[in-house]
Amino acid sequence: MTFAKIKFSAQIRLETGLHIGGSDAFAAIGAIDSPVIKDPITNIPIIPGSSLKGKMRTLLAKVYNEKVAEKPSDDSDILSRLFGNSKDKRFKMGRLIFRDAFLSNADELDSLGVRSYTEVKFENTIDRITAEANPRQIERAIRNSTFDFELIYEITDENENQVEEDFKVIRDGLKLLELDYLGGSGSRGYGKVAFEKLKATTVFGNYDVKTLNELLTAEV
């Protein structure tokens, strides 16, 4: 019986400010209009695993679906087996687990004199008919922040012969994410990211990851 878990790790470096929204339900008067999501313990920005998973799946659907899927449950088999499928007749647990990504270079940012791990960007929308301005404040995790990225991939008898194919899809997803954006307001310059120090490690069972590491660093 084959059973192993592979940890795929990397550093997510922000090349521009990142906005992934948090709750503003209890915002005080004069507070930021759109805060970022933060770790409730440290009050430091995080990148939710759900944001990474959703964005990567959306981008990969443009490549691996033969036609436009109205819902994720209509995705191709290769995406369904990696990300899961909740449709009753096609229900399938995904092979991937996306972890929340936490800030990893706080000390480096502190040494540069950074006073806050977020910034506030002031934006304005103008009503084209009345010319009335609608100013707003958007919070962003600052450029050059790095976050620990971790992805778990499960190998069983069912998918032992599909591992390399799956990892090529994962590699494509990361490349597409670098060429697109993460979070909101990407068309206005937010959310440009880079994945650095890519590495696959066997964390349970026995599986030789040499070929997988070669795939991860190969040009797409």
UniProtKB/Swiss-Prot annotation:
Q: Indicate the enzyme's highest-level EC class.
A: hydrolase
- Swiss-Prot/TrEMBL keywords: Antiviral defense, Endonuclease, Hydrolase, Nuclease, RNA-binding
Describe activity control: Target ssRNase is inhibited by EDTA.
Pfam families documented for this protein: RAMPs
Molecular function (GO) terms for this protein are: endonuclease activity; RNA binding
Cofactor: how bound: Endonucleolytic cleavage of target ssRNA by the Csm complex requires a divalent metal ion; Mg(2+) has the best activity in vitro, but Mn(2+), Ca(2+), Zn(2+), Ni(2+), and Co(2+) also support cleavage.
Cited InterPro entries: CRISPR-assoc_RAMP_Csm3 (IPR013412), CRISPR_Csm3_endoribonuclease (IPR052216), RAMP_III_fam (IPR005537)
Does the UniProt entry include the keyword Nuclease?
yes
Set out the biological process GO terms recorded for this chain's protein: defense response to virus
Q: Which PANTHER family match?
A: CRISPR SYSTEM CMS ENDORIBONUCLEASE CSM3
Q: How does it assemble?
A: Part of the Csm effector complex that includes at least Cas10(1), Csm2(3), Csm3(5), Csm4(1), Csm5(1) and mature crRNA. The Csm complex is elongated and slightly twisted with a maximal length of 215 Angstroms and a diameter of 75-80 Angstroms. It has been modeled to have a central protein filamant of Csm3 subunits along which the dsRNA helix of paired crRNA and target RNA binds. The filament is capped at one end by Cas10 and Csm4 and at the other end by Csm5; ssDNA is thought to bind to the N-terminal HD domain of Cas10.
Q: Which family does it belong to?
A: Belongs to the CRISPR-associated Csm3 family.
**Name of this chain's protein:** CRISPR system Cms endoribonuclease Csm3
- Organism of this sequence: Streptococcus thermophilus
